Amino acid sequence: MPRIVNPLDEMLFKEVLKEQQRIRVYIEKARYGKLKTIIEGIDEKEFDLEDIAKKLKAKLACGGTVKKGRIELQGDHREKVKKLLADLGFSEDLIEIE
C-alpha cells in the first residue's frame, strides 16, 4: 500500500479498494451434513476480516470464524451476505455467488 499521510486520503483509498475487491461467496458441507457459507477474496492486509466477520455474524445471528484468509459462517447465507457486504461498501457487481 502506498504511504498516505492525510487521514481523508486513507479513507478514500480504502473506499476505492472496497470497490475493486472480487469476492467469492459459496457453500461447503461441514460435519454431519451441515452447511457453511465461505467468503473469500477480501484482502486481509487491507481489511480487518475479524471485524467484517463479527458484523456479519451479528446481522445474520449465526456463528462463524476467520480461517486461512476467508470468512466461514454457519449455515447458508449466500444471498444475505451479498447485500450485507454491499452495505459495508463492497461493490455488489464484484460479489460472485456460487
UniProtKB/Swiss-Prot annotation:
InterPro entries: DENR/SUI1_TIF, SUI1, SUI1_arc, SUI1_arc_bac, SUI1_dom_sf
Xref: CDD domains: YciH_like
SUPFAM superfamilies named in the record: eIF1-like
One MF annotation (Gene Ontology) recorded for this entry: translation initiation factor activity
GO biological process: formation of translation preinitiation complex; regulation of translation; translation reinitiation
Keywords: Protein biosynthesis, Translation regulation
Key word Cytoplasm present: no
Repeat keyword on record: no
UniProt similarity note: Belongs to the SUI1 family.
Protein name: Protein translation factor SUI1 homolog
Organism from which the protein derives: Thermococcus onnurineus (strain NA1)
Lineage, broadest ranks: Archaea, Methanobacteriati, Methanobacteriota, Thermococci, Thermococcales
